[in-house]
Amino acid sequence: MLFRSSYENGRNRKVENGIRPTGSEMNKVENMGKNGQRIPNGMLVDNYPRNMWWVAAHRDEIREKPLARWILETPVVLYELEDGTPAALYDRCPHRWAPLSEGHVCGDKIVCPYHGMEFDTGGNCTKAPTQHMTPNTAQIPAYPVKQAGAFIWIWMGDPEAIDCDPIEVDYQIDPNWSFIHGYMEVAANWVLIRENVLDLTHIAFLHKNTFKQDDWITAPDVYMEGETVCYQQQFDLAPLSPLFCAGMGLPEDKPIKRVQKGRMPTLAISFSDWDVHDANPDPGCRSDFIMRGCHIVTPSKRGKSHYWWGAAFDVPSISEEVAAKTKASVVAAFNEDKELLQKLQANVAADPRGLDFLEVTLGADGAGIKVRQILNKKLSDEGRTLS
């Protein structure tokens, strides 16, 4: 399935099959905090839906040797087969529990580093060098994986429940785009990151020294298109954040018109597009640009998460200097998120009351509320609850 994160039919595209929140609905969201009500997010427990695709790795991470990665509190080994396709197994040999990720790949088999036992992509032991017979009980879980775009996706739940392909982000490997990306491990529950990247109003405060975009103080329009959470917001003329000026070749002090658009097609991935318009471009220069942000989050161990981010510019090539400068600036901003979310997680986890205290919800939390509703629905479909 090919997913394009930008609205393809124009900047002022009307919402089709989507519902924008009415004034009464926004008041309802605001009143949730006043009444002490909230939708649980399960940030201290196992709040990971299994029957969905999660990103396991960037494709480049598994090309040279097996990769060990904790996913949904499960040790997984990811490796590449002879034809270049990915494979994933439980990262523990059933003999004496050595991590298979410390072994090596031989053909399409992964070899345990401890006693040389070999396992196929189905998790079956095909060879035990220290004896003639292969024990038929020597099996480990295997997980469906698929490469889509630049990422390897994994399905940790029931394989029979797979009903879609993972999201493919075409511009990440499109030569007409310049793509900057990074990864960090965050000591916070994944849902905190997901809510954070869908909340634009924190940027004017938490990122006042990095984004330097102080007009992000009002709530965007939040609506649904099918099962996709969407938001959109138009801004008056103002200088663009210095994080992205260099990538677009724009001066940091020039008033620019921009439209912010976001989509979350699944809990695992969301997109934030900057549609930028320069009303008075210099001679021979473009007037319109697009910057596409990508936010991928996958649960790791309890209270820890994997976070991949990307920033793509609709410019065929930017210099290494500009790419390095932009990446350093983005990392500095995201480290501000990381530091705050990690302290938030630690503070709540240390409180003996757990989650049993008031959480106020503001009108600007519309997208975050949608995240929690979707999360609780998916867990309910799997026979689980956070209540």
Residue ranges and their predicted role:
Residues E8, V15-E16:
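Acidic, Ala/Val/Gly-enriched low-complexity intrinsically disordered segments
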Residues S5-S6, S24:
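Serine residues within intrinsically disordered or low-complexity segments
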Residues S5, R59, R96, A148, ...:
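Generic structural signal for bulky hydrophobic/aromatic residues embedded
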Residues G18-R20, T85, E160-S387:
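C-terminal catalytic domain of Rieske-type non-heme iron oxygenases
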Residues N12, I19-N27, N31-G36, N41-Y48, ...:
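Rieske [2Fe-2S] iron-sulfur-binding domain
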Residues M1-L2:
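Short, small-residue-biased leader/transition segments that mark boundaries at the very start
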